Amino acid sequence: MTLRLSRRAYAEMFGPTTGDRVRLADTELLIEIERDFTTYGEEVKFGGGKVIRDGMGQSQRVAADVPDTVITNAVILDHWGIVKADIAIKHGRIAAIGKAGNPDIQPGVTIAIGAATEVIAGEGLIVTAGGIDTHIHFISPQQIDEALASGVTTMLGGGTGPATGTNATTCTPGPWHMERMLQAADGWPINLGFLGKGNASLPQPLVEQIAAGAIGLKLHEDWGTTPAAIDNCLSVADDTDTQVAIHTDTLNEAGFVESTVAAFKGRTIHTYHTEGAGGGHAPDILKVCGEMNVLPSSTNPTRPYTINTLDEHLDMLMVCHHLDPSIAEDLAFAESRIRRETIAAEDILHDLGALSMLSSDSQAMGRVGEVIIRTWQTAHKMKVQRGALPEDTARNDNFRAKRYVAKYTINPALTHGIAHEVGSIEPGKWADLVLWEPAFFGIKPSMILKGGMIALAQMGDPNASIPTPQPVHYREMFATRGGALARTSLTFVSQMAADAGIAERYGLAKRIVPVRNCRNVTKADMIHNAWRPSISVDPETYDVIADGQLLTCEPATVLPMAQRYFLF
């Protein structure tokens, strides 16, 4: 006997299916389910009178043959697709994406549920990979709480706390600081990796930082990003299979953007602040988007361009870079970095896939808890101002959604050599997953899983008779306690450091994972974000021309994902 359900009734019971569309928060972005892995009439759902019961949707298989956790009927939004599926997690990793149930009595089951299986109800929820923020100033450890609550599960950058150098640059300088920061990483339920200081003209000061555990090196203009330092740093990176991140020379003291590109010598580099106001060669750092060896990112303070963007930037810049507004040269330095024309162009370059990544620049002009919000606000603004992308249809914004989610998930992972572990929802990867109600997508996750275990969730009064009574707010869960913390989060290091046994020498509790394949990644590998336009910036007007087209747009006067979500 069969029962025909309306689409609305089906979606309310099991979540949306193929052909259904979902609005992301209060934006103008609509995603459409491309495929449903479940079988109609054989869906599994937990609860009283529901399917996942002994002898029904739950089989008799032992723990070795079933997942530890199944997320049922979830909508997966990832760079590779937008699908409805059950997600299996085993030993902290994504084990399968498919159809869960009891294979002894149900057809088409690819994920067997057993008595050893926990269930998370994903009906009506969107699941994304945990975000990766590659531009962290480790100024305060409390940033980690904010980042995790926003859906970020991996933080890469440098620093030692609120030291003056860290306030301005993302460097953890020297072996002693590197060891201390790696030891500190054991205390936080998030994946961490640290960049050493790359500003030196001889190899040994850099090699010793890689050997101490750095995942790469950071060149920053405040330490002197000269062509000699760039060349030396990239040579060390090539020898150690690590990445280099660079904040280029705003003042053009040691050369112009062409000098910096020449110093790259075609070698792979992650260019921070490839943007309209964050720093680097003024006014034309955007030119580097056209280089095959350059992996460009921008940061969230200029995302997206609004009527308030320019006003807040001057004071932020003066504080972050230890400048004095009473000194004319310092003021001129700051003003040279803030250009409305290049900020506007940054919006469009993101939308067309020329800028491959988006990060925070935490407490150093950027907001650590707003990477994901600002990404989707930019996508919304571009949809409203520029319409559908050529790859999309009138029904949905699927390609645009895949392009923007890739900017803070898979592309940062590929850039920094950690894509074998994190960055996407694929079997074999670490189960860092973020669950969202569509109305709160990108803003306030319902639950964050780290290594397959719930680390943070919206939870009501712990003394209440049920989980939901107010006050409901984010509370740390069991993955953040005791020995579970070290077994559900990762610390990324160089292969050189791992081979040298730093885990034992430093007494680290977390599993260390070496980065790899950092030197052979190119712009062509940046998923959905590989466009390499020929860019010029007028030195007088700051107009940005890409492949012969003027890139300009109006500032937004109002944004979604903003005040209506943060009244309390």
Swiss-Prot record:
Task: Look up the record and name the pathway of this protein.
Answer: Nitrogen metabolism; urea degradation; CO(2) and NH(3) from urea (urease route): step 1/1
GO BP term (any one): urea catabolic process
Q: Which GO terms describe its molecular function?
A: nickel cation binding; urease activity
The residue stretches assigned to a coiled coil in this entry are none
Q: E.C. number, please?
A: 3.5.1.5
- The UniProt annotation places substrate binding at 220
- PTM annotation: Carboxylation allows a single lysine to coordinate two nickel ions.
Residue(s) carrying N6-carboxylysine:
218
Q: Which SUPFAM superfamilies match?
A: Composite domain of metallo-dependent hydrolases, Metallo-dependent hydrolases
Which cofactors, if any, are listed as required?
Answer: Ni cation
Gene Ontology CC terms, in alphabetical order: cytoplasm
What CDD domains would the database entry show? Urease_alpha
Compartments it resides in: Cytoplasm
The record's annotation in InterPro entries points to: Amidohydro-rel, Metal-dep_hydrolase_composite, Metal_Hydrolase, Urease_alpha_N_dom, Urease_alpha_subunit, Urease_AS, Urease_asu, Urease_asu_c
Q: Where's the Urease domain?
A: 130-568
Keywords tagged on the record: Cytoplasm, Hydrolase, Metal-binding, Nickel
Q: Which family does it belong to?
A: Belongs to the metallo-dependent hydrolases superfamily. Urease alpha subunit family.
This chain belongs to which protein, by name? Urease subunit alpha
